[in-house]
Amino acid sequence: MTAPSTPKPSRKKPKPASPAKPATPREKASLHPRNRHQGRYDFPQLIKSTPELGQFVILNPYGKESIDFADPAAVRVFNRALLKAFYGIAHWDIPADFLCPPVPGRADYVHFLADLLASHNQGEIPRGAAVRVLDVGVGANCIYPLIGYSDYRWQFLGSDIDSTALAAAKAIVQANDLNKAISLRQQGNPKQILTGLLDSTERFDLTMCNPPFHASLDEATRGSQRKWRALGKADPKRKLPVLNFGGQARELWCEGGEIRFVSQLISESASVGQQVLWFSTLVSKASNLPAIESALKKAGALESQVVEMSQGQKQSRFVAWTFKDKAQQQAWSQERWMRKN
């Protein structure tokens, strides 16, 4: 999505937000306990269910089976195999040059959001169609709705400004007969994120977002080159994709970068604050958190959290915030989940 100038929310100034408090970090490289992707992958089993993966399997420098993560085709087929083997998604494909995200990290985000809902439901994760989630910027891959429905049977609405991405996501949804669980909607104004997207009667228990985190195409390319070096693929004689793991320009960068996009998302969330229990977004850089906390205070968020995650050598996090006080949060859970679980 393309981020414009951040609009100023027209609303009364509420009580100051509780400071965003980082969760206690877990052990390095530890996935969420409910994440299906613990340990090494059983490549023979993956190849059995997705035979086309076989042509991409190699031995890494440690003699273990893997794939070449510098090859977008290999990553795409690997994701297809994982989604089929672990989540029962029989048909999955995306157009060339669209973001092909690593599945384990995306699953972690979903599981930690489930924990957030459980904290309002006597420690029990609310499951089924009673829970509605908005995926802001669903992309062609439709990854969060697929995981969230498979693991928790939640209902999803995926939004995007890109009609090609939505067409690809729709093809995935229809091919897997998930039309009743996953809906898609185009944000008609590419300069807006939430504004004008939702009906006034719609309610969502969660929103989630994987924002564009670079401020320019050049910055995105440099970030990709750093990843290639980390993967040991920075061979100047080898032609590599410009952007790591694919990704259209608007998926990876926007004017002002992550801070501007997330600040706008927060600002716009204030206008629909009573329609959503918890908003959330991934944040790629910990150094962006102070600016994001300032945006939360400015928007009038009453509570916020920073949840740290780890996948292999990668450290990631998401920020969650709400415009509801404790009493309103409790009333929400009683009305929407406790009667239906």
UniProtKB/Swiss-Prot annotation:
Pfam families: Methyltransf_10. Its EC number is 2.1.1.181. GO terms for biological process: rRNA base methylation. The keyword Secreted does not apply. It catalyses: adenosine(1618) in 23S rRNA + S-adenosyl-L-methionine = N(6)-methyladenosine(1618) in 23S rRNA + S-adenosyl-L-homocysteine + H(+). One of its GO terms (cellular component) is cytoplasm. Residues 1-41 are annotated as: Disordered. CDD domains: AdoMet_MTases. Signal peptide: none annotated. Belongs to the methyltransferase superfamily. METTL16/RlmF family. Specifically methylates the adenine in position 1618 of 23S rRNA. This is Ribosomal RNA large subunit methyltransferase F. It comes from Pseudomonas fluorescens (strain ATCC BAA-477 / NRRL B-23932 / Pf-5). The lineage of its organism: Bacteria, Pseudomonadati, Pseudomonadota, Gammaproteobacteria, Pseudomonadales.
